[in-house]
Amino acid sequence: MSKKNNLLVAASGTGGHIFPALAVSKEVEDKWNIHWLGVKQRLDSNLIPKKYNLRTLSIKTPRKNIFLFYQYIEILMSTFQIIRILKEKKINLVFTTGGYISAPTIIASKFLRIPVIIHESNLIPGMVTKYFGFLCNYVLLGFKNTNSYLRNCKTIFTGTPLREQFYKSNPLPEWVPKGKGPLLIVMGGSQGAKAINQILNESLEFLLKKQFRIVHIIGESNQQPFYIKNTKNYIQKKFTNEVAALIQNCDLVISRSGAGTINELIEAEKPSILIPYPDSKNNHQEKNAMIIAESGGSVLINQNNISKEVFEETLERIFKIKSKKGVNHYEILDLMKRNMVNNKIKSKNEIKKFINYFLKEF
């Protein structure tokens, strides 16, 4: 049996960084020993399998304030720590998905002349990809048009890999409310979204009167959860591993518009109402949302414009019943479903090809 090479995966923070890296790790673990580098006090310890040898560093989120200098010192110290880890584990290749762990990892890898691949899942590249992408051997893109923002990088369009469950059909979980009413999945990403939770809280009475069934994922890091007692047609959870099954079997998703969510909706061909996070870097969540909103597969509502009235009117319009040849159907929802089919992107094995390419080249 040939000896496996060592792959360091540097991904941390939000599900948008972690889930694509997990998907890639699962695809290549038969040929590589996986070592995972993350950040303390984030989602990493809950999501990363023990077999991936998770190591965490203390890196705080950079902020524009008087302590910025000390944060850069912290990043520099992290770079030296990562150099030691790369040497200790005899790493042959580094794969990263952006985020605060990525910058020192890229610098450390280039110092040791270890090849680096970074994957950029957003349409508008993040800060690390923008400023450090040129140091990487390849920048893999979730969307084709991202190439125009990275002229000095070696870019390859691969799409964004998703969790394994999204590539197969999954039954609806037993705990989901039963009934004939439309099923809504409301979620704010792995960290939750206060604005989405709030608007749902305000409109819940209206939705239940309209016979909607609702699964509400409030997020792990929501410090003050909008606790509402579960009822026949409403279930609230902090987190679930059954997101693929929920999205595949629901009628409509209401969510933020991180790149991971956009690609999950595209894969499942699922209509949505998207409420982009307004403080995302370079407004990238709104740009992500526009990819499917412009094709008619989603309704984009800016957080500054959303209200109880706007939210309820939007849902009433989407679920307005039309009769055709004696058969009732949701005309706008059905049109949104057809439009989502045109957005299909297949990306499951593309990144695997490029990672395994380095087995031969290095």
From Swiss-Prot:
GO cellular component, one term: plasma membrane
Family under the similarity heading: Belongs to the glycosyltransferase 28 family. MurG subfamily.
EC code: 2.4.1.227
Keyword terms of this UniProt record: Cell cycle, Cell division, Cell inner membrane, Cell membrane, Cell shape, Cell wall biogenesis/degradation, Glycosyltransferase, Membrane, Peptidoglycan synthesis, Transferase
UniProt cross-references to InterPro entries, sorted A to Z: GlcNAc_MurG, Glyco_trans_28_C, GlycoTrans_28_N
Residues annotated for UDP-N-acetyl-alpha-D-glucosamine binding in this entry: T14, G15, G16, N122, R163, S190, Q285
Localization in the cell: Cell inner membrane
Membrane topology recorded in Swiss-Prot or TrEMBL: Peripheral membrane protein
Top EC category: transferase
Pathway annotation: Cell wall biogenesis; peptidoglycan biosynthesis
Function text: Cell wall formation. Catalyzes the transfer of a GlcNAc subunit on undecaprenyl-pyrophosphoryl-MurNAc-pentapeptide (lipid intermediate I) to form undecaprenyl-pyrophosphoryl-MurNAc-(pentapeptide)GlcNAc (lipid intermediate II).
PANTHER family in the cross-refs: GLYCOSYLTRANSFERASE (PTHR21015:SF22), UDP-N-ACETYLGLUCOSAMINE--N-ACETYLMURAMYL-(PENTAPEPTIDE) PYROPHOSPHORYL-UNDECAPRENOL N-ACETYLGLUCOSAMINE TRANSFERASE 1 (PTHR21015)
Identification of the protein by name: UDP-N-acetylglucosamine--N-acetylmuramyl-(pentapeptide) pyrophosphoryl-undecaprenol N-acetylglucosamine transferase
One GO term (biological process): regulation of cell shape
Organism: Prochlorococcus marinus (strain MIT 9215)
Single GO molecular function: undecaprenyldiphospho-muramoylpentapeptide beta-N-acetylglucosaminyltransferase activity
Reactions the enzyme catalyzes: di-trans,octa-cis-undecaprenyl diphospho-N-acetyl-alpha-D-muramoyl-L-alanyl-D-glutamyl-meso-2,6-diaminopimeloyl-D-alanyl-D-alanine + UDP-N-acetyl-alpha-D-glucosamine = di-trans,octa-cis-undecaprenyl diphospho-[N-acetyl-alpha-D-glucosaminyl-(1->4)]-N-acetyl-alpha-D-muramoyl-L-alanyl-D-glutamyl-meso-2,6-diaminopimeloyl-D-alanyl-D-alanine + UDP + H(+)
